[in-house]
């Protein structure tokens, strides 16, 4: 196929030749994208039809998420479904009129063949152009209107916070999440099952706020079952994108940077709350995997590992019964029973390693010592890991995306806060410095690029890139005590409010001002696989408003949430980050300031406790311009100040005194 990148050359050619545009959107770790490439795009006869009748454009959805959002929204409006590969047909002026996902090379699965679709659309474009233009106009109008979904139009900024956000709303969110929860296998909804990290995090925080044991039970069940499942790489660490079954046995084997970052976030909170070493070990092993397989030598993080190797999904990760016997010898029977390895296989005639029962439970069933069993299993896992290492590896998508890197930086900060391992702070700092060095736009003040690869950065950053980066800068200050990160967060927030704000000054567009190659500026408010940029910006504005006493930022954050609150309460699994914001609005934020020569030690001690809703600042001396750190200094003392809602209590010397006050 004569593929073009999305750009001026292809778009002008479509206008000059008056040809429809075929846009195929996929991503490197997408199994069905590879299948369609192999079956259709690499077939000469099919390629001839595509080249003759269409201007063909291929887009990596991770490089251009703005275009993916627009055309996926159009596909869902047309068909009620979505997914990748996303194949969408446009008029020469970029407006969508038809689309679909995977099409087979011959008619099958109740789908027409790809060639049939191409020829029918080419004929329709020539013979029924008016119908096509009408459909394109309708869809484009829908795309503009979809920005309004779920939001109330009038500003609610004048209503007191305690009237807008209530305990009753938090309770309803909890009940709505629980109504979708799988009480046996954890997680939410039916297969395919995604991790649901935002809902798990809400349950942890709801329990911490209101002492709700059932919320904690469901959150921990979800984490435990994923950690025991095939969705988690039992040998090498790291989580796959989702499970194809309700038991978390058979994953779709691609490993994404963002999933692992978000799971490290929530595992860190679970560890702070429970001190369960299974969570600390999973964090340790997952970050070891990230560092070993998904990190550039200069410190940035790669995007994804493919599901396939040698053209077979999961081949790198699965085992035959005979292989395990050969490697482990007399230890094999016990290992195979524990990890469900059988002669006939537990998935497509091969075996995915997973724990049907937790190790301690299995030890009790077998009447053997749990510590001795864990030691034996650890040795077995190491032997199998060494045996697996020379296999042909899944493909690596080595793009370095600003937003996903920011998610992993945030995760490293959370892991450092929870476990105290200095190496995680080093990883976070190096990755942030990588972003600052390689993804900044020197010609655009505070601007950034979206993606970097092989020394080249491209595409202006999108809202979620900037929102996640601000959040990561805030987290980095909280664990390092370096206030420079906070200054950068404030400057980037000012840039975002200038470049991304909508006309009402409430929400933010996904793209910056002046981007000419999109047919509509979308506003993304759902929390999908990654958080909504708007939800994270609301949290950033609320945090920085407290730090810098910026009342207008606090008002905007409140208004963003208030206009959405009814929708958030009804659909919390689609608005999980917003739901967490609502809970924080109800509970309030602890503002903790530490001033004195031992401030870093005291800040470190704060992280030993689970305090999910906090602002934490520290410095050796007073800091003019930061109200929480003004007029706090006392000679030879390190003092800890606790404030909430513009009211502070008497400073204390020791962290235990603060912990008692927080309780």
Regions found by a protein language model. Give the residues of each.
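Replace the tail clause
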Residues: 1-411, 415-418, 517, 561-663
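Long, polar/charge-rich, low-hydrophobicity segments
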Residues: 292-295, 443-467, 474-624
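Catalytic nucleophile-loop/oxyanion-hole region of alpha/beta-hydrolase
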Residues: 279, 424, 457-460
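Glycine-rich, acidic and aromatic/proline-enriched surface loops and short helix-turn segments
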Residues: 225-232, 430-441
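Inter-helical turn/loop segments and adjacent helix faces that build the functional surface
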Residues: 206-210, 270-278, 415-422, 476-483, ...
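Conserved helix-loop functional segments at active or binding sites
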Residues: 386, 390, 414-418, 434-441, ...
